[in-house]
Amino acid sequence: MPDFSIENEILKLKNNKECIIVGVDEVGYGSLAGPVVSAAVFFPNYNNETTQDINDSKKLTPKTRQKIYNKIITRVKWSIGFAHIFEIDEYNILNATHIAMKRALTGLNAHIDIDYVIIDGNKIPNIPWNAQAIIGGDTISTSIAAASIIAKVTRDRLMETLHIQYPQYNWNKNKGYGTKDHITSLYKYGKTIHHRNTFTPISKISYMFKNS
């Protein structure tokens, strides 16, 4: 289970001086449709019941994830950042993800003065704060794991809303990822404005419809 070992180690390096350490994670990197969503999270207290059961969002059932989300959003400082379809297509998915992360951090920094950022992954976006990238960070750091939960619940809700407009793609279940039913629907109905044109399945299907 994630804990605050990394956060506490950073505090030691700072001689235990007050240091606002923010965890960041994203959701939607590999999806064929919908935005990339990033969350930035700061825990004011590392030793309370708020942290119980927090884990990498991918390891939680939707019901458990929602329950933890409801608990933590009132007890931590957090912010969300989006990177939209046109940004994914124009700048590529990695750069768009970094845009979403920067937006989440900028939103949070408007309310607290960020000192240090820990990010899930192996790359650090161009941000004005000292930062550390941690591969598998959402399984190690509670701050990052909480960010993964908030980002996941936020994005899932968005895809469920879009499903109402485009029910044939089953986004309420696949959340825009390239599942068999999603691919089948793409070949049958074509793409929507919410699909990522630069992703191979979409570009292939677009070409097929254009030349049919």
Swiss-Prot record:
It comes from Ehrlichia ruminantium (strain Welgevonden). Endonuclease that specifically degrades the RNA of RNA-DNA hybrids. Manganese or magnesium. Binds 1 divalent metal ion per monomer in the absence of substrate. May bind a second metal ion after substrate binding. Keywords: Cytoplasm, Endonuclease, Hydrolase, Manganese, Metal-binding, Nuclease. One of its GO terms (cellular component) is cytoplasm. One of its GO terms (molecular function) is RNA-DNA hybrid ribonuclease activity. It catalyses: Endonucleolytic cleavage to 5'-phosphomonoester. It is found in: Cytoplasm. Residues 19-212 form the RNase H type-2 domain. Its cofactor is Mn(2+); Mg(2+). PROSITE patterns: RNASE_H_2. CDD domains: RNase_HII_bacteria_HII_like. Transmembrane segments: none annotated. This is Ribonuclease HII. Belongs to the RNase HII family. One of its GO terms (biological process) is DNA replication, removal of RNA primer. Coiled coil: none annotated. Its main location: cytoplasm.
